[in-house]
Design a protein with these regions (language model features):
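Short loop/turn segments immediately following the C-termini of beta-strands
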Residues: 6, 51-53, 102-103, 113, ...
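Blade-edge beta-strand/turn elements of extracellular beta-propeller
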Residues: 14-31, 66-84, 112-132, 156-171
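Short, conserved, GDST-rich strand-edge loop motifs in beta-rich repeat architectures
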Residues: 3-4, 48-62, 199-202
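Beta-rich, blade/repeat-based domains predominating
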Residues: 1-5, 28-46, 61-66, 78-99, ...
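Short loop/turn segments immediately following beta-strands, especially the blade-tip
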Residues: 110-118, 200-208
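A detector of repeated loop/turn-to-beta-strand junctions in beta-rich toroidal repeat architectures
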Residues: 8, 62-65, 105-107, 119
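Hydrophobic beta-strand positions in blades of beta-propellers and related beta-sheet-rich domains
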Residues: 1, 11, 67, 97, ...
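A short, acidic, flexible beta-alpha connecting loop/helix-capping segment that sits on the rim
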Residues: 173-175, 184, 191-197, 202-205
Length: 216
């Protein structure tokens, strides 16, 4: 399955045989603004950010930006409102959802969830404010040991599970997004303005719920 969350004010699911299905395009009867990033949970639910990027104010049906979830039965809910939510990723145990806020207060928020997916607590996980002007908190991934990787000012920032900053991965261009790939999920891919860069990691990325890592 492929999820296309950007550009047409809806989240669309595409299967390998080119069949498409609209996952969500409205909340409480109003058109969502412009979804940005999407992740899936092992229970089959789909979670995405909607910062309303480049939607004229007059065209916005919903006054807020936020994080939404959609259950397999199609039931949707607003998980939390944000100023400008962008990348998001689950912790390995799926008890915490990390969300990057791109503008002004450049924080990664940690949303702690109960077993039903409701927010029980929200806190600041990491501060990505920087004097570097190239790059903002954007794409995000987590590895199997719980480290959080987020593209941002100057490169890809790496945080320990407790929020402590480990360092910054520098690439020739500042990337906007990243992914773990390859048969063992130890190849990191960084997408930037003109190129895609790769780096081998000692630790595999957290697999998607439907992905099985091939052991070596």
């Amino acid at each position: 399955m492929r999820f296309i969350p950007y550009g047409n004010r809806r989240v669309t699911r595409w299967s390998d045989d080119a069949h498409s299905e609209v996952v969500m395009d409205r909340y409480e009867g109003k058109r969502i603004n412009r979804p940005n990033d999407v992740v899936c949970k092992s229970d089959g639910s789909i979670w995405f950010t909607d910062p309303g990027l480049r939607v004229p104010l007059a065209d916005k049906d919903l006054p807020h930006s936020g994080v939404y979830s959609v259950k397999p039965d199609g039931t949707s809910r607003l998980v939390a409102e944000f100023e400008y939510p962008n990348g998001l990723a689950f912790s390995p145990d799926e008890r915490t959802l990390y969300v990057a806020n791109t503008r002004h207060a450049q924080y990664i928020h940690a949303i702690e969830l109960d077993t039903t997916g409701n927010m029980v607590r929200r806190r600041i996980f990491a501060d990505m404010s920087s004097e570097e002007t190239d790059g903002v908190p954007d794409g995000m991934k987590v590895d199997v040991e719980g480290r959080v990787y987020c593209t941002g000012p100057g490169g890809t920032w790496v945080f320990a599970p407790d929020g402590a900053k480990i360092g910054v991965i520098r690439t020739p261009e500042v990337p906007a997004n990243l992914a773990f790939g390859g048969p063992d999920l130890k190849t990191m891919f960084f997408t930037a303005r003109t190129s895609v860069y790769t780096l081998r990691s000692k630790v595999p990325g957290q697999p998607h719920p439907w992905y099985r890592v091939r052991a070596k």
